[in-house]
Amino acid sequence: MESTRGYLDMELLRFSTAGSVDDGKSTLIGRLLYDSKSIFEDQLEAVEAASKSRGNEEVNLALLTGGLRAEREQGITIDVAYRYFATPKRKFIIADTPGHIQYTRNMVTGASTADLSIILIDARHGVLEQTVRHSYISSLLGIPHILVAINKMDLVDFSKDVYDKIVADYKKMSEALDIKNVVFIPISAKDGDNVVNKSDKTPWYEGPTLLNYLETVPVGHKTVSDFFRFPVQYVIRPISSQFPDYRGYAGRVSGGIIRPGDKIRVLPSGTESTVKSIDFVEEHLEEAYAPMSVTLTLNDDIDISRGDTLVKADEKQPSIEQDITLDVCWFNERPAAVRNKYVIRQATFETQGLIRSINYRRNINTLEKEEGVSELKMNDIAEITIHTANPLVFDKYTENKVTGSLIFIDPDTNETVGAGLIK
């Protein structure tokens, strides 16, 4: 019981891995799991058997990350593969995201909740287009820490000159994109150099190993706003003799804290009331905070529907607009163009909307802002302005990731075609 409680109380670090194809993301995760003794004997036996069936003389640690069978047989990661492990100092959730350019949308999904992003670079190839793309997306998503793991150092004889050039190239790129808090570590995921254990092949490197850095990097606990935000997911009105007059509003707290007696405002209508109770299963809570899912009851019977947002009346209010400027990452093969119409979904709110203007597109190769663009193609990153049929209640993404983000849905196919971060 004590060991279980200790595990639950341990600090959690969520991190994602990203890089170009074959940079060694899955091998790195496999090495972390293997060297930190976070795999079971039967898992290792299965990987050894799979490695032999492929004709590999050594154990292919990339197979430890699992994923779909078809993807493993191709030797690539397509979907986002999540892994969990712990050391005596911290517990971790890893999102292994795809390297192929056509799967950038999966990388956005995997990195959206991360505290840290590991960007892998093949020491033989240096900074590539996908390196820039993944770094820029990590920056847009507000990930507070970026760890650049320069992998396959064994294939360049652990050359300090090669390492220094890649560091210089990355710093030049990161400064142009205003990316901060970057740490560089030379590694060989295949052989384990500087992953968990310090390597004697890089005497010129005096920094931490990759795992040591993951165990000690500050975890940003402030991932949501200090101001109360409660997107209403469902209105509960049970018709029963036990609860004849019950009317509750279910949802997840996406910012701040709420207590019975607090004065709230319903947006976008502006109607006000006070909190009567905070219900969770069959309990009445004294308070609720992010990211708790609860049901609120109010002292007044007012009109509230799914998609409305409850806020505290005496706190900073979110914006309520129909014209919104945001950064967008386009996911779909069908281009986005001015006047194109989409379903806009933000938290529990859904409305029709259209692209009013494409303000600029970021050129990933030159890092310049390209103006006068008529459409966005798959994997383009741009700043656009949209117009919604109904007012949107929102915060900036940097202030609240839930109320500051939205997705674009194709009304014909119901596919998610883009993700937006409100500026």
Predicted segments with their positions:
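Helix-rich terminal scaffold detector
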Residues: 1-3, 9-34, 38, 50-53, ...
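P-loop NTPase switch module centered on the Walker A-proximal segment
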Residues: 4-102, 114
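C-terminal effector modules of nucleic-acid-centric enzymes and ribosome-associated factors
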Residues: 14-17, 155-158, 162, 172, ...
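Residue-level signature of catalytic and energy-coupling elements of molecular machines
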Residues: 22, 28, 47, 75, ...
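Solvent-exposed alpha-helical segments within well-ordered globular domains of core cellular machineries
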Residues: 30, 42-45, 49, 66, ...
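Conserved Switch II/interswitch segment of TRAFAC-class P-loop GTPases
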Residues: 90-92, 97-103, 111-135, 141-164
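Conserved catalytic-core segments of large NTP-driven translation/proteostasis enzymes
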Residues: 164, 171-334
